[in-house]
UniProtKB/Swiss-Prot annotation:
This is Vacuolar protein 8. A lipid is attached at residue 2 (N-myristoyl glycine). It is a lipid-anchor. One of its GO terms (cellular component) is extracellular vesicle. It comes from Candida albicans (strain SC5314 / ATCC MYA-2876) (Yeast).
Amino acid sequence: MGACCSCLGNRGGDGSHTQLLLAENEREAISALLQYLENRSDVDFFSNGPLRALSTLVYSENIDLQRSAALAFAEITEKDVREVNRDVLEPILILLQSADSEVQRAACGALGNLAVNTENKILIVEMGGLEPLIRQMMSTNIEVQCNAVGCITNLATQDDNKSKIAKSGALIPLTKLAKSKDIRVQRNATGALLNMTHSGENRQELVNAGAVPVLVSLLSNEDADVQYYCTTALSNIAVDEVNRKKLASTEPKLVGQLVHLMDSPSPRVQCQATLALRNLASDSGYQVEIVRAGGLPHLVQLLTCNHQPLVLAAVACIRNISIHPLNEALIIEAGFLKPLVGLLDYTDSEEIQCHAVSTLRNLAASSEKNRTALLAAGAVDKCKELVLKVPLTVQSEISACFAILALADDLKPKLYESHIIDVLIPLTFSENGEVCGNSAAALANLCSRVSNEHKQYILNNWAQPNEGIYGFLIRFLESGSPTFEHIALWTILQLLESNNTEINALIKENETILAGIKNLSASQQQIQQSQIGQTTTTTTTNITNNNTNTNTNTNTTTSTSNEDQFEDPKVELFNLTQQILQILG
C-alpha cells in the first residue's frame, strides 16, 4: 500500500503532534488498518472491520486521514474490482465532496475503478455520484479532471446511465475538456462523448451542447485514440437526418478531413472515417461531395485490403455513393468494377456480398455503357455462378440485380448467351417473395421482344430446368397472387407479341396454359364488367423491381413491390387476359 497510508505511521515532528490530537476511534482505526494492510492478501477491505476502519478515516476532520482513506480506496479498487454495495460507495462519495485536490483525485480514481463493473455503474449514478463528478471535472487540477472524466466515461458505457448523464449537465464540461492540452483528459473526454452517441435523444443533447464543432476540430489531432473517438462519435451523429443537414450547413471541412483519415495508419481510424462517410452518404448532397473531395481512390484501395471490417465499411460507403446518377461513370472510371465483383467471393460475409451486388445494381441502372462495362467485368457470370448457393439476403440482392439488367434491351443478347435463364427458373421456386418476384420479373423481361436470332434460348428453356418457362407460367397463373398472375400474363403477352411461330405454337397448343388464362379471365369478368368498354387497352409496361437503397449505420434492404405499380391490379389482370385471348383468336 506504501505511500497511500503514509500518515498512518508515526512520522515524528508535526506528524507526532497530529497523532496526539486524534480521537480514540481514529487511533483504533489506524491501528486496525495497519494490521489489515500487513495481511492484505487475506483481507476483504469491502466488508466489516476493514471497511469500518476506512470509513472512520473518511469521516475524520483530519485532512491527512482523509487523504490516506482516499489513497487506500484508490489502490484497493485498482486491484480488486467487483460488485460492491452502498456501504462501500458511500464513504467514497463523501470523499468526493472534499475541497482537497489530493482527496478528490484519489476518490475519483477509486470510483472510476469500481465503475468498470456494470452493477456498480448503475449504483453510483443512483446514489447521486454524477453531481460531484461534474464538479470535479471543472477542477483546475489536471489530475482531478482526468480521473473525474475517466469515471464519467466508464459510467456512460451503461445504457441506463446515458440519458441521465446527458441530462445532468455533464455534456458541456465534457465538450470543454475535449479541448484540454492534457492528452489523458482529451482521451477520456472524447471517449465519454462517444459513449453518449448511441441513442438519438442523447445525440441531440450532444449537438445542443455544442460538441460537433469540437469533435470535427479534433479530427486533425495527432493522437490516434482521440481521432478514433471523434470519428466514431461523428459517424453515430450522422445517423440522424437532421444532424446530417446541420453538418452540411456548418461543417464544410468535415468530408475532406474524413477522406484524409481513410489513409490513417490506424485501421480502426480508417474504418470509422469510412463509416462516417457512409452515413453521410445517406444524403444525395454528400454522395456528390465525397466524390469531389477525392474519396473514390481511397475507397477503391480499401476494397482490396486484408482487414475485413475495413472492406465492409468501404463497400457500404460506395454502395451509398453509387446511388447518385452523377457518380456512376466516375465510379466505373475509378476502377471499382473488378474489386466489387471480387467481393462476391467473400462467402464468410453476407453483408459484404450484399453491398457489392447492390452497388453493381446501382451502377447498371441507367447507362448502356455502364451495363456493358459491368458485363465485361464478369459481374453477371459471377452472380450466376453464386446465386443458387448464397444466403437468402445475398440471393435477394442478386435477383434484384438480374431484374434491373433484364430491363435493358441492349443487354439481352449477352444475358441469353450467359444462360442466365438456367438460374432464374429455379429462383422462381423460392419461398421468399422478393427472390421469387425479382427472378420472375427478370425472366418476364427476357421473354419480351424476343428476336428470331435469340428465340432458341426461349425454346431450349421452355421445359427445363425445373419444368422451364412453361412450368413457371403455370405456377404463376395458378398462384392466387395478383402480382404473380400479372407477371405470368404479361410474360405470355410478350411472347405472343414477338410473333415467333414456334413460340406462339407452344402457347396455343398448351391446354394447361390456355385454361389458366381463361380461368383468370372468367374470375375477373363479372367484377370488371362495369369497368371495361368495348375496346381493350394496351400496355407496354416492363416488369420492374428497383430496390436501390440508402442505408445508415445498420444495413437494411428496401424494395418496391411490383404490386404497387398498378392502381387497380384486377382491372390490369382482366385487360391482359383479353389482349391474350384476342391474339389467340
